[in-house]
Amino acid sequence: DVCIANEEDAADVFGIKAADTGVTAGEVNHEGYKDVAKQLADRFGFEKVAITLRESLSANDNLWSAMLYDTNDYYFSKKYKMHIVDRVGGGDSFGGGLIAASLLGYQPQKTIEFAVAASCLKHSIEGDFNMVSIEEVKKLAGGDASGRVQR
């Protein structure tokens, strides 16, 4: 079983809060989210817990990353600085990226990198659909953040 949440879900729904983190101030403490993921896994029996981590610089500019707890190990994605065109669909794109990477047989680190890259790219597109190709996601996840159109 897999749990996908954002940095506020565990606190708002289950009362599990990350230590030394101020979501509204854009402060994310990785150690605190390790504890949140472990508590969710222990309490509900999840094998994997994925948590997106948004750090607000402004309403339109954020730092975006995520962590994946998988069988007692923790994996953190790289952090992207992104200008937001539309947030709608960003979480769905993260979940879709996580599922796609799992179905492709990716290892946990590559899985979380792929999911975050898919979501990051979606934030740059207006509307609810992520209109990027799997190749574009792979390139960004693999380190190509040049922003050059690859079509």
Tell where the protein language model's regions lie, with residue ranges:
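Conserved phosphate/ATP/ADP-binding segment of small-molecule kinases
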Residues: D1-N72
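Short linear functional motifs in flexible/disordered or boundary regions
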Residues: G15, G22, T52, D61, ...
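Short charge-dense sequence patches
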Residues: K48-A50, V88-D92, R151
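Conserved post-catalytic alpha-helical subdomain immediately downstream of the catalytic base
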Residues: Y74-D144
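…primarily DNA-binding HTH/wHTH and HhH modules…
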Residues: G143, G147-R151
